[in-house]
Amino acid sequence: MKMMTIYIISLLLMIGFVAFASKPSPIYGGLSLVVSGGLGCGMVVSLEDVFLGLVVFLVYLGGMLVVFGYTTAMATEEYPETWVGNVVAFIMLLFVLLLQVGWYFMSKLVYIIMAIKLFDFVETSLVGQDYNGVSQLYYCGGWALALLGWILFMTIYVVLEVVRERSY
């Protein structure tokens, strides 16, 4: 059941990426990226790494929502272009999905590699990924957390500078 869940999430992830690549209006492009990011986090959670999936979901999608909120507000269109005009991308998507589903049912072999599960014994110690994640994030990865926060702030600042109106 777990293997099928990950397979379905990966198919939905591919649909989200093709929806973004078909160059719709910025509103729909941002929506497809947010949905794809959520599906990617769902895949990480289904591989038994709940803490990492939650951190990525909160930080990445929170930052994306702020950036896309500002850029969408600055780039609103009266009649936004939808995905209907991009028939070639959808035909390509349907073809690839048909190939994947056909491959799955023809071979019946889908491998998922998991090195360390939750509460596995590695040599002599017990590995609990979720409970040690918070302390490791602030202890060993505190500098990376501060750096990523600064990068997210600078990204928002640069986007605002690029899209603001200049009055001369």
UniProtKB/Swiss-Prot annotation:
It holds the Pfam family Oxidored_q3. It is a multi-pass membrane protein. The chain crosses the membrane at residues 1-21, 27-47, 50-70, 87-107, 143-163. Keywords: Electron transport, Membrane, Mitochondrion, Mitochondrion inner membrane, NAD, Respiratory chain, Translocase, Transmembrane, Transmembrane helix, Transport, Ubiquinone. One of its GO terms (cellular component) is mitochondrial inner membrane. It is found in: Mitochondrion inner membrane. The keyword Transmembrane helix applies. InterPro entries: ComplexI_Subunit6, NADH_UbQ/plastoQ_OxRdtase_su6, Nuo/plastoQ_OxRdtase_6_NuoJ. It comes from the Eukaryota. It catalyses: a ubiquinone + NADH + 5 H(+)(in) = a ubiquinol + NAD(+) + 4 H(+)(out). The keyword NAD applies. GO terms for biological process: mitochondrial electron transport, NADH to ubiquinone; mitochondrial respiratory chain complex I assembly. PANTHER family: NADH UBIQUINONE OXIDOREDUCTASE SUBUNIT ND6, NADH-UBIQUINONE OXIDOREDUCTASE CHAIN 6. Belongs to the complex I subunit 6 family. Core subunit of respiratory chain NADH dehydrogenase (Complex I) which is composed of 45 different subunits. This is NADH-ubiquinone oxidoreductase chain 6. It comes from Didelphis virginiana (North American opossum). The gene is MT-ND6.
